[in-house]
Swiss-Prot record:
Originating gene: uppP2
Known catalytic reactions: di-trans,octa-cis-undecaprenyl diphosphate + H2O = di-trans,octa-cis-undecaprenyl phosphate + phosphate + H(+)
Stored PANTHER family: UNDECAPRENYL-DIPHOSPHATASE
Keywords tagged on the record: Antibiotic resistance, Cell membrane, Cell shape, Cell wall biogenesis/degradation, Hydrolase, Membrane, Peptidoglycan synthesis, Transmembrane, Transmembrane helix
The family this protein is said to belong to: Belongs to the UppP family.
Organism: Clostridioides difficile (strain 630)
Function: Catalyzes the dephosphorylation of undecaprenyl diphosphate (UPP). Confers resistance to bacitracin.
Entry GO MF terms: undecaprenyl-diphosphatase activity
Spans through the membrane: 6-26, 46-66, 94-114, 119-139, 183-203, 227-247, 262-282
NCBIfam families: PRK00281.1-4 (NF001390), undec_PP_bacA (TIGR00753)
Name of the protein in question: Undecaprenyl-diphosphatase 2
Amino acid sequence: MMSLDVIFILKSVIIAIVEGLTEFIPVSSTGHMILVGNLIDFKGQFAEMFEVVIQLGAILAVVVLYWKKIKDSVIEFFKFIFTGGKEGKIGFRFGMNVIIGCIPFAIIGVLFYDNIKSLFNLQSVIIGFIVGGILLLVVETLFRKKNHSTDNIDKITPIQALKVGTLQVLSAWPGMSRSASTIMGGWIAGLNSPTAAEFSFFLAVPAMVASSGKDLFEFDYSIMTPTLWIALVVGFIVAFIVSIIVMEKFVNFLKKKPMRVFAVYRIIMGVVLAVLAFTNIISV
């Protein structure tokens, strides 16, 4: 019995590593967790809740890594309000941009929550991988080097934030990737790649906390056992640690290289999965 518990915890660690590796790069963490979950038989009611919790571990990584920026922006946001705009203008503008950027995703999430949840399957992931990869190639080719004068998140305008937020809606489809969608939105809006990626990190905090809250509130905690609680805590910690490492390296990567390598990876992965599904080697 104990060996089965250890194996289950090891499976949870694998999923948490996958989450940490893929949450903030444009390859879709949800898609990879669904895929790996199918391969190692990590599925079911707990697995769905586990994925929500470890995504919060990844979000905590954003808070820790950018704590000073978040703290200063919150303080300046309220300074601006209470001083009638005499102080804290930069922090207020940044906070409003984050709010504006989250509005489109929030509307879609509220109106189509059940429809979105019904898409969480391997077939949707395959479509998301391929379509998202093609879009990434096209948008990078057309917009990445065109008028990208915005090189700092404090210089982002409300219109730019809205454009990024509108593209974030694409990530409601499993396999599309929230990171890919927001970075593409950043390119279209005139942000350079590192700035688009960093703004994507900040948009992730309210978007994912809000979407996770409903799932955690509705979860049936009566099924929880000591093994499941251990898996949950360990998974959260692992996702947090891996996410911090990946975020720093990803921003540095974007300062030097294009993202087409991720686009090609997505397309190849999608085609391979489609072939495996068509030949019944894996089930969708």
